[in-house]
């Protein structure tokens, strides 16, 4: 199975980590990377305080995301990274570092997003930033390498749907 480097994207609470980890269990020689772990401490503190990040805040983080993908690919692994990648310009920045990146936008109903964020424990992204993220989100354009997948059903079904859509798109 030939799978490109994947960016599982969307707003907080859409299931990026769950889907990404599920994909890694199905894709040989793959590695899961949580882009949240690549944020500088100052970004984490801003978000924890309920302050939305600016594009300037995100720039070094997006570069680190692209480098992490490129490094994994160079090591012979298929990176599967959970990363919001909300704007086209952010995705282009990732593509500049990893030109083979393929984006999977997880599309989740707003009420479900709110429920998920309220139930989360030990995550620095407060539910109060959901509106900011939804306002920032730019859906994938037809010329971008990626697919949008509606998130319905149990997590395992979503993983299978995502994998099928990625393989069909290639």
State the predicted function of each range.
Residues 5:
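Walker A (P-loop) ATP-phosphate-binding motif of ABC ATPase nucleotide-binding domains
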Residues 8:
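Hydrophobic anchor at the beta1->P-loop junction of P-loop NTPases
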Residues 11:
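P-loop (Walker A) phosphate-binding loop of NTP-binding proteins
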Residues 16:
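Conserved lysine of the Walker
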Residues 21-66:
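Conserved substrate/cofactor phosphate-moiety recognition/catalytic segment
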Residues 56-98, 106:
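Glycine-rich phosphate-binding loop used to anchor ATP phosphates in small-molecule kinases
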Residues 97-117:
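Conserved phosphate-donor/acceptor-positioning beta-strand/loop module used by diverse small-molecule
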Residues 119-161:
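Small-molecule kinase domains that catalyze NTP-dependent phosphoryl transfer to phosphate-bearing small molecules
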